[in-house]
Amino acid sequence: MMMAQHVLSQGMTRYQPLFGTVLITLALWAIQFVVYAFVPLTMRSHALTYLPSMLLLGMMSAVVPVGADSIEMGFSWYAPILILLVWWLLTRVGRLAQGVEYDKVIGLFSQPMWINALIMSLLIILVAWMGNSNAVLHYRMKIEHALLDGQFDRALKVGKKSLESDADLTMLRMYALARKGTMGEHLFEYPVTANSSQMLPTDSLSVLMMYPADSLYKFLGARPAERMEPMRYLQLLERRDSVINPAVADYQLCGYLIDRQLDKFASAIGRYYTINDSLPRHYREALTLYTHLKSRPVVVYHQTVMDVDYNNLQELEKKYPLFSERKGKVEEQYRGTYWYYYKYQK
């Protein structure tokens, strides 16, 4: 609903959940009232008068995004027509059945009550079937809504325990983390399914549906003059500014980590951070991994706890020669670390 209203109003209005729920409920009830006036079904088939309202509700919740500024229905155009045709036939049968004798029992256990309950259950299933049930899209819309409210902590809690993600969701989480100044500390606690070319909307490979891109660019320092790769955009920002924007620095460093470019990461991190134990966690993990992988590293990083933890990871991997089994065991203990992302998350 939020996405549909934003697109249809071209960003001029925002969907208010409480007001929208009340308004939609009243509108659907009014439709049912009108339908009942023209098709006065009673007793066993009364619930059929709710089908047009429920069908409209399903259509309203079935929209899917197309790019950054348009939507479309997530089902074929003929589906509602076919459903209405079946409904019309059922109403004919229901009108004829009203003249037939029925169970005189009135109340919870009457036959008409249970038949109507069954019909309403089927209508609810119809709405659920028609509606957009894409979990990742719902996460994206909730995060963008939280960003519009300036609630970055709330945005970062959305879908945190889920393994489902996409490039747009990763981009939104990176931005929320950047606003908190914790990208280097928490990014790989989430499933990262993008690469550096998708971590910003500068090249249109990832899109924002509701949150204005201008707000993101203002935070980073400038709007790109043309389409360009995010890393190129960040490098231009760094060259322009005499004082390095910490968010720009973290975006570049995390871009290298996402692409598994440890050499570039190791060469760049010294420009932004003092190499010591106070580095953000994922940067310490990356430098530890880099030091162990390279025979002649440009940066040698050792930290007792981190070295012990990495050695334990290597010992754990040696116990399981089969990749699938090894991945499962490592995931149990190391999911949320850069080490797990680098070696196992594709």
Region locations from a protein language model:
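Internal/C-terminal transmembrane anchor helices
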Residues: 109-134
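Soluble catalytic regions of membrane-associated enzymes that act on cell-envelope
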Residues: 131-267
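Membrane-anchoring hydrophobic segments
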Residues: 1-52
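Membrane-interface helix-boundary motifs at transmembrane edges
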Residues: 35-48, 98-112
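Hydrophobic alpha-helical transmembrane segments
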Residues: 32-42, 61, 65, 126-131
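Alpha-helical transmembrane segments of polytopic membrane proteins
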Residues: 11-28, 73-87, 112-113
